[in-house]
């Protein structure tokens, strides 16, 4: 087992009584980090449904690289990766969760077939901290991020996710953070606050696939309305990571079924304690 963050080989106190879940969260606007929104409340509530994890492995839409990278920092920085149009209060947010260099090294070994490498330049982007600050406000759960390799098709992302699945047996929470429906031009140009019909239609199609037909999800670009509902591959692909980290026999629990113009906030969990 991995040692405490930054201490190679040291024993980590194990708190595991249950296999950690695999989650997908629709993270939406960075403002969810500092506002009392239905989605933020949903993230806080879902964290109460299972034991606090020993660590989190996060795949965020906001870290795209050539090659698979794994954060190795003992103390990852809080990255404010959004424009200056947001309020200063958002730039003031710090989420000082520790990293876990030992877990990072183990992940690189586990993902050898995919050419994974350690990276000490990245930190925690807003696809990560805007969500987990509601789940674990004390910032006391170590986090390691795994990047999205821009060179790989969806089927290979699914294979990478499958390689991460057994981490859950060590009470390590696997999270994909993106959005099933993510079309920012459609959000900004919407004539009203009501979501377009295709937002719910496409979201419901993918929800059905998450529950019953993973092939439909992995082949998401071939589904009706994909070109308008899911034009941003990096926001959809984290769905595939939660999907691939599922264990046989697990059924999804859906929450945060909120729709906005061009955006769905749907989230789901596999493996919640019964």
What label would you give each PLM region?
Residues 109, 113, 141-143, 150-152, ...:
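Surface-exposed, charge/polar-rich loops and edge strands
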